Amino acid sequence: MRDLTPRQEEILNLIREWIDTTGSPPTRAEIAQHFGFSSPNAAEQHLKTLAKKGALELVSGASRGIRLPGGGGLAVVGQVAAGSPILAQENIERHVQVDTALFSPRADYLLKVRGQSMKDIGILDGDLLAVHRSAEARAGQVVVARIGDEVTVKRFQKRGHTVQLLPENADFEPIVVDLKRQELVIEGIAVGVIRSGRSL
C-alpha cells in the first residue's frame, strides 16, 4: 500500500470504525457529512484515490460498496426468493468473513435465499448465495434476476425476446418473461453457496 495522506488515514479509520460499530461501511454521503465535505462526490474522489493506493476496494453499484482488504468480509444483502419472488431489500444485514478466492468469478456480495425452488442443485432455504455482480448471463447460468422491484434466483434461458427463469425443483413452475412487455434485469451470477448452522 502506498503512503497515505493524513486525511486519507482519517477516512480509512472512519470506515474501519463504522464497520466495527454498525457491521457495514458508511455511504459517500455519510463520509462527506462527517468530514464537512461539500458533497458526496468529494468523498467519492477520496475513496477512488484510496482504492488506487490499495487501501480499499470499491464495489460498483452499491451505496455502501466499500471493502477493506482482509477485513469487513462480504456484505450479506437483503433476501432473495428461491420460490415466489419477494420484494428486494438492498439492506446490508451484516458482513461475513469469506475468502473471495474460493469463488470464480469472484463473489461481490452474498444474498440470503428464501424458499426451496432451487433445492435440487443444493441451494436451500436460508443459504447465503455468493453472487458475482454482472448485468449479463449465459444460457444455463444460475442468476439473481429482478423483475420490476422483485428478485428471484433461477436458471437462465433465453430464446428471442422470451426469457425463462427455471426452478430446480419439480414442485415449482418456470417464470416466463416477455421482454417486450416486462423489464428484466440480471443483478448477478451465482458463483457458490455458503451454508452454516446445520448439522449433518
From Swiss-Prot:
It comes from the Bacteria. It holds the Pfam family Peptidase_S24. CDD domains: S24_LexA-like. One of its GO terms (molecular function) is serine-type endopeptidase activity. Transmembrane segments: none annotated. The record marks 82-83 as: Cleavage. Its EC number is 3.4.21.88. GO terms for biological process: DNA repair; DNA replication; negative regulation of DNA-templated transcription; proteolysis; SOS response. Residues 28-48 bind DNA. The active site is at residues 117, 154. Keywords: Autocatalytic cleavage, DNA damage, DNA repair, DNA replication, DNA-binding, Hydrolase, Repressor, SOS response, Transcription, Transcription regulation. Represses a number of genes involved in the response to DNA damage (SOS response), including recA and lexA. In the presence of single-stranded DNA, RecA interacts with LexA causing an autocatalytic cleavage which disrupts the DNA-binding part of LexA, leading to derepression of the SOS regulon and eventually DNA repair. Belongs to the peptidase S24 family. Homodimer. NCBIfam families: lexA. This is LexA repressor. It comes from Thiobacillus denitrificans (strain ATCC 25259 / T1).
